[in-house]
Amino acid sequence: MPDSTIPLLCVLGLLALSSACYIQNCPRGGKRSFPDLKRPCMSCGPGNRGLCFGPSICCGEGMGCYMGSPEAASCVEENYLTSPCEVGGRVCGSEEGHCAAPGVCCDAESCLLDSDCLDDSKRQPPSEQYSSLMEGLAGDLLQWMLHATRRERPQ
């Protein structure tokens, strides 16, 4: 093989390697894959009325948010799906959050109280705003606490 072809082969080899897809910026499926289409996030919670906001967060209108509870256990499956999901609702908070329930802003990691998410609930009469508080685990806990304070106290 002539000596002039070795440098040419080295240059072509380096060129081929430098146009590769680096780990940091590769799309799923490689550099020639199609972009991921967003799909709605999985349903969760009692009666599948909520949506998964993260691997252990399930929130829905009228039911509030469940974090790390059995109602949110099905949200772990989102991690194993290849295409990303998109949660509807208004954008809120500082970390790509979305309004999950009246007054609650959630992202994939956590939920926070956010007044930007109260607009929808302000239109409801006060009796309907607080009716969801008495449903589910929050209502059970509130009733237990009220019952515990009414018990006879030792003298």
Swiss-Prot record:
Q: How is it modified after translation?
A: Seven disulfide bonds are present in neurophysin.
Q: Name one GO molecular function term.
A: neurohypophyseal hormone activity
* Pfam families reported for this sequence: Hormone_4, Hormone_5
The subcellular location is:
Secreted
GO cellular component annotations of the record: extracellular space; secretory granule
Keyword annotations from UniProtKB, A to Z: Amidation, Cleavage on pair of basic residues, Disulfide bond, Hormone, Secreted, Signal
Protein name, as recorded: Vasotocin-neurophysin VT 1
Per the UniProt record, the source organism is Oncorhynchus masou (Cherry salmon)
